[in-house]
Amino acid sequence: MMSKLGVLLTICLLLFPLTAVPLDGDQPADRPAERMQDGISSEHHPFFDSVKKKQQCCPPVACNMGCEPCCG
């Protein structure tokens, strides 16, 4: 029984070596500087334009009440 399990494990490791598994450091999410250089930032992405367009300026009185978009 143990020899069959050893043969099966050897075959699996030969067909799917552990080096084929990507490491965490290879993921683009771990390198935010390179991800931002790709030009896929949320400031220039078309999906986020509708969110920015919906924000309108608040009247000056609303700045005291916590309205953020134009109080800066």
UniProtKB/Swiss-Prot annotation:
Signal peptide stretch: 1-20
Keywords: Amidation, Cleavage on pair of basic residues, Disulfide bond, Hydroxylation, Neurotoxin, Pyrrolidone carboxylic acid, Secreted, Signal, Toxin
Parts forming coiled coils: none
Pfam families with a match to the protein in the record: Conotoxin
Disulphide bridges, residue numbers: 57-71, 58-67, 63-70
GO cellular component: a single term: extracellular region
Tissue: Expressed by the venom duct.
Domain notes: The cysteine framework is III (CC-C-C-CC). Classified in the M-2 branch, since 2 residues stand between the fourth and the fifth cysteine residues.
Protein name per its UniProtKB record: Conotoxin TxMMSK-04
Organism placement in taxonomy: Eukaryota, Metazoa, Spiralia, Lophotrochozoa, Mollusca
